[in-house]
Amino acid sequence: MKDVYLYIVEKSVALEFDSAEYGRLARKTVELLYDRKEELTDDRIAILLNISTAETRRILQYLMKQNLVGVKKRSTEDYRIEYTWYVNDEVISQAVKYRAKVVREKISLMIKALTEEAFYVCPNCFMRYPVEEVMERGGVCPICGSHLEYVENVEEINKLTKVFEKLDKI
């Protein structure tokens, strides 16, 4: 499950910041937190990874909003607020289960749409169109002008159902 978690962290950060490098930094950050099994401040993480504190904070705050890391807030002796970050098996489990739930919901909607409607696909650009839209456009793809082809949804529904069942076991 840890590998799935690391993949989720890396890809979500890379997409959010439009940078594969940020994705790799996020992966290193959570690996560090998990391997050390202790709560660390963002300054300490930045020093250990040899990256700027600003980058570390940016990544950690995004991961916190996505519930991909744990955070604790405490007051210091000089009345400043200090955040400490952690990753443990519970954080990983909750993150993966939440992502699986979101994907299951999307797959469920896709299965419902595929069972309730017929679709046509463009053989060139592979865009999918419902019957109503095909009738309005005269069976021609609005993007490339190719003739749209009817698609049997049974195989696709079966594949999606199998994926849904696998995710249900998580």
UniProtKB/Swiss-Prot annotation:
Free-text domain note: The winged helix domain is involved in binding to DNA in the preinitiation complex.
Subunit comment: Monomer. Interaction with RNA polymerase subunits RpoF and RpoE is necessary for Tfe stimulatory transcription activity. Able to interact with Tbp and RNA polymerase in the absence of DNA promoter. Interacts both with the preinitiation and elongation complexes.
Family: Belongs to the TFE family.
Residue stretches making up the HTH TFE/IIEalpha-type domain: 1-93
Task performed by this protein: Transcription factor that plays a role in the activation of archaeal genes transcribed by RNA polymerase. Facilitates transcription initiation by enhancing TATA-box recognition by TATA-box-binding protein (Tbp), and transcription factor B (Tfb) and RNA polymerase recruitment. Not absolutely required for transcription in vitro, but particularly important in cases where Tbp or Tfb function is not optimal. It dynamically alters the nucleic acid-binding properties of RNA polymerases by stabilizing the initiation complex and destabilizing elongation complexes.
Pfam families to which the protein is assigned, alphabetical: TFIIE_alpha (PF02002)
Any one GO molecular-function label of the UniProt entry: DNA binding
Entry coiled-coil feature ranges: none
Keyword Transcription appears in the UniProt entry: yes
Keyword annotations of the record: DNA-binding, Transcription, Transcription regulation
Species this protein is from: Pyrobaculum calidifontis (strain DSM 21063 / JCM 11548 / VA1)
The name this protein goes by in its record: Transcription factor E
GO biological process assignments: regulation of DNA-templated transcription; transcription initiation at RNA polymerase II promoter
InterPro entries per UniProt: TF_E_archaea, TFE, TFIIE/TFIIEa_HTH, TFIIE_asu, TFIIEa/SarR/Rpc3_HTH_dom, WH-like_DNA-bd_sf, WH_DNA-bd_sf
